[in-house]
Amino acid sequence: MPRPRRFRRILGEPRVVTFSPEASDEETGVEITLDEFEAIRLRDYHDIKQKKAAEIMGISQPTFHRTLTSARGKIAAALVEGRPIILKGGDYITDRRRYKCMDCQFEWISPEKEYKKCPDCGSENINVVSAETIPRFGRGGYGRGFGAGRGAPRVCKCIECGYEAPKTPGVPCRTEKCPKCGAPMCGAD
């Protein structure tokens, strides 16, 4: 039994879905799936390296390469044969809203809901982050995953005596006081 196809992440649907030659009498167009369109957009239009583009789409680099090669072949056939290009279909999910709290550094994705406050600490100091602009760390500019990979802290630590307590979800560590010395706590892992 073959493995199920993994959904590809696209950052938005194209504004135009059909490209047609001016004097085209050809009725059958070349269909390019939206995941193939996204591969072309990331690699050829934005000039993002294949490894990073594959991470953005949530697929492996070999799968990204196959998708890109397929799209380029279809576009070449349409140009040479004078056929229309139709963008539609494919196995994809949209990733329009990626959020990051600037106070507690918590990151989350929500394609349906628009957030005004951080679900972890309640801060209104949040930014919508594009997957293309997320900085990578480590040798060569690429790391494993987003940012430093820590996410929100799981432990609150006293800055004076070193006392540690489990973090309460939705309550920023900086609002907690150390039960031993009364000093403010901070997030730590």
Curated annotation (Swiss-Prot):
SUPFAM superfamilies: Sigma3 and sigma4 domains of RNA polymerase sigma factors (SSF88659). It holds the Pfam family DUF134. Belongs to the UPF0251 family. PANTHER family: PTHR37478, UPF0251 PROTEIN TK0562 (PTHR37478:SF2). This is UPF0251 protein MTH_1178. It comes from Methanothermobacter thermautotrophicus (strain ATCC 29096 / DSM 1053 / JCM 10044 / NBRC 100330 / Delta H).
